[in-house]
């Protein structure tokens, strides 16, 4: 059933993840200064499911119980649109800056479950895990990337065969795994999902695996990077105080994975095709397009308010820059709409959003985002670094700040609050991390384009040109005759 924020927080207190920060075990992330902000933010998302204003958007009813909308297995385009509306509502709460809200990976697990026959002997495990996640409404994280030890060599060619996560042995109770994965974003989750990573070569069977575990599992460790939380003040740090999700290295120190939590084992082909064959790639990208749309809307809103606030909106070059963001926003909306309107069933009967539209969005946005960020910096200019704190306004020089930092259409404190938001979106550590995240969210941009080149059906367009040239040659020969 749809969870509440209090239930999420209580689960973190009762079964905290094995979280390490600056060499120390984090015993209670709900009160830790680095993590308490994102914990409150996640709890607020769960509570939104119970708000009478949003209940019908964020949840659906099945067998007398209400579940999060991201668990709905779509049968119609209307179902897809309902899922998209729920994605967008959650994304709007944090200006599209939260990449690991639960709906992101719920979309993957839902697609896996709806296409469970793909997983052969582990099909029932996948179905059961979906029902478990849905009924408990758990938060999940995942880790896809192998440690960057030697990127020129496959997993089996690393200095230690257990640098990437691999199977050590099989027992009556399950499989024992050892190794590590990088970039587990949002470790304040109930569960961690280890799904297929990069394409595996033949002979890499011990790395061909997919499974899920509670984040509190013995032998499982999340080692955090340095925090980007600037402080507790939502005035000074409007984003990092609330949406610092944290990124981690995940270590598996001979961890037992029970058989009922194993989804793929030793099958390289299944691993390599899992996302595409099940529709998980499309459904994950559907959530992402809604998220990026919300993010682009936020940049547009901030840019427009900044320009108006300091009287810069009268200049043509400023209008041009803001219009550029509008163009990008409308492109994302078009990708999103087409993905839903041209959805088709996959081989397992799951309605899947159109991949062509989604591939367009997920290849374009990593190139758009740095430009969107740059536009905000160009509009804000020196105003983005002349930003006193909340305490300065309350201090003895407050009256001076009210005079010198006012805007054409804003009081001083309003103007500084707006520009501090723009600073947190662009120039702060949080803002810089957001750009890196967007550049590589779906992987190496060059490989992404190569994949698009290889999977996209170019034949109809090639044939049109052949026919055109053939007709042109025919006309030329007739004229010559």
UniProtKB/Swiss-Prot annotation:
GO terms for molecular function: 4-hydroxyphenylacetate 3-monooxygenase activity; flavin adenine dinucleotide binding; oxidoreductase activity, acting on the CH-CH group of donors. Pathway: Aromatic compound metabolism; 4-hydroxyphenylacetate degradation; pyruvate and succinate semialdehyde from 4-hydroxyphenylacetate: step 1/7. Keywords: Aromatic hydrocarbons catabolism, FAD, Flavoprotein, Monooxygenase, Oxidoreductase. It catalyses: 4-hydroxyphenylacetate + FADH2 + O2 = 3,4-dihydroxyphenylacetate + FAD + H2O + H(+). Disulfide bonds: none annotated. InterPro entries: Acyl-CoA_Oxase/DH_mid-dom_sf (IPR046373), AcylCo_DH-like_C (IPR036250), AcylCoA_DH/oxidase_NM_dom_sf (IPR009100), HpaB/PvcC/4-BUDH (IPR004925), HpaB/PvcC/4-BUDH_C (IPR024719), HpaB/PvcC/4-BUDH_N (IPR024674), HpaB_Deino-type (IPR012687). FAD binds at residues 142-144, 148-151, 185, 444-447. GO terms for biological process: phenylacetate catabolic process. Pfam families: HpaB, HpaB_N. Substrate binds at residues 100-104, 142, 197-198. Its EC number is 1.14.14.9. The keyword Oxidoreductase applies. Utilizes FADH(2) supplied by HpaC, to catalyze the hydroxylation of 4-hydroxyphenylacetic acid, leading to the production of 3,4-dihydroxyphenylacetic acid (DHPA). Belongs to the FADH(2)-utilizing monooxygenase family. PANTHER family: 4-HYDROXYPHENYLACETATE 3-MONOOXYGENASE-RELATED (PTHR36117:SF3). Homotetramer consisting of a dimer of dimers. 4-HPA 3-monooxygenase consists of a reductase component HpaC and an oxygenase component HpaB. This is 4-hydroxyphenylacetate 3-monooxygenase oxygenase component. It comes from Thermus thermophilus (strain ATCC 27634 / DSM 579 / HB8). The lineage of its organism: Bacteria, Thermotogati, Deinococcota, Deinococci, Thermales.
């Amino acid at each position: 059933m749809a969870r509440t924020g209090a239930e999420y927080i209580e689960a973190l207190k009762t079964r905290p993840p094995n979280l390490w920060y600056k060499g120390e075990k984090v015993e209670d992330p709900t009160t830790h200064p680095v993590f308490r902000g994102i914990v409150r933010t996640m709890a607020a998302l769960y509570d939104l499911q119970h708000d009478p204003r949003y209940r019908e958007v964020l949840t659906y009813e099945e067998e007398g119980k209400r579940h999060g909308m991201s668990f709905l297995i779509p049968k119609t385009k209307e179902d897809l649109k309902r899922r998209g509306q729920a994605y967008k509502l959650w994304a709007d709460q944090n200006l599209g800056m939260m990449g690991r809200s639960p709906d992101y990976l719920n979309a993957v697990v839902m697609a896996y479950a709806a296409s469970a026959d793909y997983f052969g002997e582990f099909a029932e495990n996948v179905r059961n895990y979906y029902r478990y996640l849905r009924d408990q409404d758990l938060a999940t994280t995942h880790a896809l990337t192998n440690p960057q030890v030697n990127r020129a060599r496959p997993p089996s060619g690393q200095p230690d065969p257990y640098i990437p996560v691999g199977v050590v042995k099989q027992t009556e109770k399950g499989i024992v795994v050892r190794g590590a994965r990088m970039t587990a974003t949002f470790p304040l989750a109930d569960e961690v999902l280890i799904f297929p990573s990069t394409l595996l070569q033949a002979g890499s069977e011990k790395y061909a695996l997919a499974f899920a575990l509670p984040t509190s599992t013995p032998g499982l460790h999340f080692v955090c990077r340095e925090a980007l939380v600037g402080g507790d003040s939502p005035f000074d740090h409007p984003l990092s105080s609330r949406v610092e999700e944290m990124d981690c290295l995940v270590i598996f120190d001979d961890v037992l994975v029970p058989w009922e939590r194993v989804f793929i084992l030793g099958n390289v082909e299944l691993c390599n095709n899992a996302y595409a064959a099940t529709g998980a790639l499309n459904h994950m990208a559907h959530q992402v397009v809604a998220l990026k749309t919300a993010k682009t809307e936020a940049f547009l809103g901030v840019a427009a308010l900044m320009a108006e606030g300091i009287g810069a909106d009268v200049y043509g070059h400023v209008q041009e820059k803001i219009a550029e963001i509008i163009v990008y926003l409308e492109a994302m909306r078009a990708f999103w709409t087409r993905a839903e309107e041209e959805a088709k069933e996959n081989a397992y009967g799951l309605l899947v959003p159109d991949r062509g539209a989604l591939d367009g969005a997920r290849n374009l946005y990593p190139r758009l985002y740095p430009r969107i960020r740059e536009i905000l910096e160009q509009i804000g200019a020196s105003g983005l670094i002349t930003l006193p704190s909340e305490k300065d306004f309350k201090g003895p020089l407050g009256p001076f700040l009210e005079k010198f930092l006012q805007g054409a259409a804003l009081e001083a404190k309003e103007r500084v609050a707006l520009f501090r938001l723009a600073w947190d979106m662009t120039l702060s550590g949080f803002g810089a991390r957001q750009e890196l995240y967007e550049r590589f969210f779906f992987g190496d941009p060059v490989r992404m384009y190569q994949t698009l080149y290889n999977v996209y059906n170019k034949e109809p367009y090639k044939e049109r040109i052949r026919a055109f040239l053939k007709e042109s040659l025919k006309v030329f020969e007739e004229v010559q005759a």
